Amino acid sequence: MKTLSSGGELASIRNRIALVDPTDSPLWGSMSAPQMICHLRDAFRCPLGERVPPPFKATLLPALLFKWLALWLPMKWPPGVRTPPEVDQRIGGTPPRDFQADRAGLLATIDQFARGTGPWAPHPMWGQLTTVEWMRWGYLHSDHHLRQFGR
């Protein structure tokens, strides 16, 4: 299973982020490429305790089942999952400013996250996660949005 605790997978995600262009169009969803860069940084800042979104509940599946399926089912995350307002760049997330600076900030935050061992802030839907679970989430969330922009 791919995680950000693997140096090779972390390098792969970093390289894919470097390929994102501010003019890239999404293959799904309504986020722009600059918004996606800021969204990912905001999301990585949550387990680091730098952003604290309010808890929210899964609507279709119990949180523990949803967590297990999302993290360990061997399939890619599907398009169309709604973004919580606190990390939606059009509502409560950090708005894009300077693309190169925003991307550099994301890369620095991912590096900080990948070096981490906790303690971690709780996930807003799934509660406390282990370091292994957070590293898996980090890979999957990044991969999902990079695929959204063909990267």
Task: Describe each PLM feature range.
Residues 1-7, 17-19, 85-97, 106, ...:
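Globin-like tetrapyrrole-binding proteins
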Residues 23-72, 112, 120-151:
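Short, contiguous alpha-helical
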Residues 79-80, 118-121:
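Short, flexible active-site-proximal loops enriched in glycine and acidic residues
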